[in-house]
C-alpha cells in the first residue's frame, strides 16, 4: 500500500508541476487527463465493504490531481500508507488548476470487476456500462468529459463502437459537457492482451486498421459516425471550439 500511495503522489505532483510550467508559457493551455474508469462489484455479501473501499480508492489519483477532498476512510488510508498531512493539504491547495482541465475517461469491457470472497477478481463485463460509471466521475469532479479510450476485438468492434457512442450521446443529452470520442488505437496492438507483461508478438485485432494499414469494418463505421454527426456542436462548456 505504501508503494501504491508513493507512486500516486509522485505522479500527480509531477503532473501538477508540469501544468504550472506550461501555463507560465501558455496561459490558455487546456489539459486532458485520461483515466481508466473502473468499478468493483461485490461477489458475495461479505465483500460489500471491500468493494466499497476499492470504489473509493479508484478516485485517489484524480482527487489529488483536481484538489478534491477525499473521504475520511481514504484520508486515514493515505496517512497510514505514508502520505503526510502537509502533503495532502498541498494537493488540496492546487485546486485552482482544475479550471484548465477536462476529464478523459477510458472504458473497456474489462473495466468492471467482481471481487469474490477469496479475494480473487474476475471480469464482470459491462454491467453498468460507460454511462453509469462516467456519470459517477462527472458528478464528483464536474469537468468536461472526453471518452479518450475504448475498443473491442474486431468481431465485436462495430457493435461496441455504436454502443459506446450511444452512451456518450445519452450523457450529452443529460447535460454532461462532452468534448470528444476516440477509438484506441488507430492500428492493431501487439501483446495488448498481456498489457506488455509478456512479449509474445501476439497481434490483437483492436485497431481501426490492421498493422498492414488495411481498414477494418470498424474503421468504415467510425468514418460513418464522424460524417453523420459532424454537424453536432460540442456540448456547452467553458472551452472554445478548436479551429486548428
Roles of regions detected by a PLM:
Residues 1-157, 166-244:
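Active-site region of glycoside hydrolase catalytic domains
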Residues 162-164:
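Charged helix-capping and loop-helix junction motifs
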Amino acid at each position: 500500500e505504501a508503494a501504491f500511495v508513493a507512486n500516486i503522489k509522485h505522479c500527480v505532483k509531477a503532473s501538477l508541476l508540469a501544468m504550472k510550467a506550461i501555463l507560465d508559457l501558455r496561459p490558455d493551455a487546456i489539459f486532458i487527463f485520461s483515466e481508466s474508469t473502473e468499478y468493483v462489484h461485490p461477489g458475495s455479501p461479505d465483500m460489500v465493504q471491500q468493494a466499497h473501499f476499492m470504489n473509493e480508492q479508484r478516485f485517489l489519483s484524480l482527487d489529488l490531481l483536481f484538489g478534491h477532498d477525499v473521504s475520511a476512510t481514504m484520508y486515514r488510508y493515505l496517512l497510514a500508507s505514508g502520505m503526510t498531512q502537509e502533503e495532502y493539504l498541498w494537493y488540496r491547495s492546487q485546486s485552482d488548476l482544475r479550471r484548465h482541465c477536462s476529464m478523459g475517461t477510458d472504458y473497456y469491457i474489462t473495466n468492471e470487476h467482481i471481487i469474490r470472497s477469496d479475494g480473487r477478481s474476475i471480469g464482470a463485463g459491462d454491467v453498468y456500462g460507460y454511462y453509469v460509471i462516467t456519470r459517477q466521475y462527472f458528478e464528483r469532479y464536474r469537468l468536461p468529459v472526453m471518452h479518450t479510450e475504448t475498443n473491442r476485438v474486431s468481431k465485436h468492434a462495430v457493435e461496441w463502437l455504436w454502443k459506446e457512442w450511444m452512451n456518450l450521446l445519452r450523457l450529452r443529452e443529460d447535460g454532461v459537457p462532452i468534448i470528444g470520442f476516440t477509438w484506441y488505437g488507430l492500428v492493431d496492438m501487439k501483446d495488448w492482451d498481456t498489457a506488455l507483461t509478456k512479449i509474445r508478438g501476439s497481434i490483437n485485432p483492436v485497431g481501426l486498421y490492421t498493422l498492414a494499414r488495411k481498414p477494418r469494418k470498424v474503421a468504415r463505421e467510425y468514418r460513418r459516425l464522424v460524417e453523420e454527426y459532424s454537424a453536432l456542436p460540442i456540448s456547452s462548456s467553458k472551452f472554445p471550439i478548436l479551429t486548428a
